[in-house]
């Protein structure tokens, strides 16, 4: 391995890398949860602000602790807490997709920042920190447009 330099990272560097990766995934799931509201309501010309989230079958209001992305769907086993009717798996799939895509955008930037090379998909690492939020915005728009198209047209 002559001629190659080895980069060592402190445990704190790896800790921050992991914390920010978890943050990116969680943020992606939360944004995608809101996108689910938009996917359902925008084609119907309904407000995305009010009324609050509710079951599409019985119209029972969904409480805040039943509205946690991915986890609530799993805890409730994909059913409404009130009427026990099935809730579409699309909701959790969109949330997971948002989380994974936000995580991949962060890892693409972080791999260049921490590792100085980008093993992910062989792409060049992102140049600056503002690129990641822009990628997140683009990903959000693509998820919204794609699922509205799949669901309603």
Regions inferred by a protein language model and the residue ranges of each:
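A membrane-topology feature that recognizes alpha-helical transmembrane segments
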Residues: 3-152
